[in-house]
Every structure is written in C-alpha cells, then in structure tokens.
Design a protein with these regions (language model features):
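Structural signal for conserved beta-strand scaffold positions within catalytic alpha/beta enzyme cores
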Residues: 13-15, 110, 220
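Active-site PLP attachment segment
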Residues: 86-88, 103-152, 179-182
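PLP-dependent aminotransferase class I/II
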Residues: 38-42, 47-55, 131-237
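Conserved active-site segment immediately N-terminal to the catalytic lysine
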Residues: 68-118, 164-168
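Short, function-defining helix-loop hinge/capping sites that tune catalysis or transport
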Residues: 23, 51, 90-94, 121, ...
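Short, glycine/charged-enriched secondary-structure capping and boundary segments
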Residues: 29, 53-56, 93-100, 123-125
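Ser/Thr-centric signal marking residues that sit
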Residues: 33-36, 119, 233
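PLP-dependent aminotransferase-like
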Residues: 1-89
Length: 238
C-alpha cells in the first residue's frame, strides 16, 4: 500500500471470501472499472491464489480497460501483479503442468526479508513474463532506474574501464541489493530445498496436533489434482 501511495494511485481493497484465505473473486470482478490498471493478488502463507480465475476475470473485463502507457497497451488488459512475498519457490498447477509462481502473473514480487523462507536480511526480487513488443533488457533497465535513484548505470558497470560517466534521468528510489546480500541469498538458494522439507515436517506435526480441535487453517498441503494450488512454501502457519 505504501508504494502505491507514493505514486498516488487510487487503491481499492477486496476482502477475503468467507471461509477462505483468498480474495473474494466475485467481489474482484464487480470492482473492476474503466480506471482499473492493476490487480495485486496476495499469496498468503505461500499458497498461490487462483490465477486462472483472475486471468479469466480480466479477460472478461477487457473492454473496460483504458491503457495509459506503452506497457499497458502491449498487455491490453488489466495487469496482474502478484504479491508473492511469502511464496518464493511455490508452484501452480495449470493444465496439468507445474509452473513456478514467478512465471504465472504478469509481474511477481518476492521478499527476502529476515523472516521469510529465503532471506538476504533485506531485499527481494521481481520477475515478469515476456511482454510482446518489449525486450526483457528494456524492462530490466526500467526497474534498475527505479531501484537506484534513476541512475543509468549500476555500480558494477560504473567500475568498468572508462565507464564512470552516468546520468540521473528520473527522481526514483534507493532499494538496490548489495553484493553482500546477494552472497547470502546464493547460499540460501543452495539450502532451500532442505529448508522447505524441514518446514513441511514441522507443519505436519502442527496439523496432527490441531486436527482434533476443529480449527480452520490455511491449506498448507493440498491435493495436487486441484486446479490451481500445487505446492506452497509454508513461511507461516495460520
């Protein structure tokens, strides 16, 4: 919400559906207007949302969409930008195929904060699916401008022979990842499968203990034959 306020977007919240930890998709569809530009689903506790349903909704509402920049025009509908802060490593079942969650929405953001499954102490990552008419390098450079005061070169490229000169082309933010943080993340990646396995073992113990109490919990494990949920990452037990 804070980042949206910084760019003066107008926000509209969609509540969760009854007896669910996902948004009310009917309310989502009803909330889309001619002014809607982006939907930000939240993968709470590492469990992916029903992205097939979300994409069906934005396709049905396509006639209402009025793009305001070149990327929006290229995508041609409301953008789906997933908040996957909890879901690094989660996967999603689509047409019988397992897709990693960073390749489901148009854009996907991950958090590597200290309390997440994979941590670099602070920081995160962002992924996107190919956008017709836009080179990935161009999209990457736009994010680099946003993350380093609008500078046209990052620290690595400034250090090259004769590469000291750069421009500041926009008033942007300072949220680039340091080499030290990246090094921590690389080690975490090597350990990640084992970390997820350990979390699964712990959650199985919780499930066994809570089952007789009749408590409603997030479906940390699900039938892989279900349409949209495959394998969550389980950073939280709710």
């Amino acid at each position: 919400v804070g980042s949206e306020m910084c760019i003066r977007d107008r926000l509209k919240f969609i509540d969760v559906a009854p007896d669910s930890f996902e948004m009310d998709y009917e309310a989502l569809e009803a909330a889309i207007t001619e002014k809607t530009k982006v939907i930000v689903p939240v993968d709470i506790a590492g469990v992916p949302c029903d992205y097939d349903r979300i994409f069906d909704i934005v396709e049905r509402k396509k006639a209402l969409f009025h793009p305001s920049n070149d990327v929006q025009r290229a995508i041609g509908r409301v953008i789906v930008a997933a908040d996957s802060a909890h879901a690094f490593g989660a996967s999603y079942m689509r047409d019988g195929e397992r897709i990693m969650c960073g390749n489901v929405a148009d854009f996907t953001s991950f958090s590597f904060h200290a309390v997440k499954n994979l941590t670099t102490a602070e920081g995160g990552a962002l992924t996107w699916r190919p956008i017709e008419g836009f080179d990935d390098e161009y999209i990457y450079k736009q994010f680099m401008l946003l993350s380093l005061h609008g500078q046209t070169k990052d620290a690595l490229h400034k250090n090259g022979l004769g590469n000291w000169e750069y421009d500041i082309v926009a008033p942007s933010y300072k949220c680039n990842m340091t080499d030290i943080q990246a090094a921590i993340g690389l080690v975490q990646l090597d350990r990640y499968d084992g970390l997820l396995k350990r979390r699964r073992n712990i959650i199985e113990r919780y499930d066994t203990a809570f089952k007789p109490l009749g408590l409603l919990t997030v479906p940390h494990f699900t039938d892989l034959s279900l349409i949209h949920i495959s394998e969550p990452t389980r950073p939280l037990y709710i």
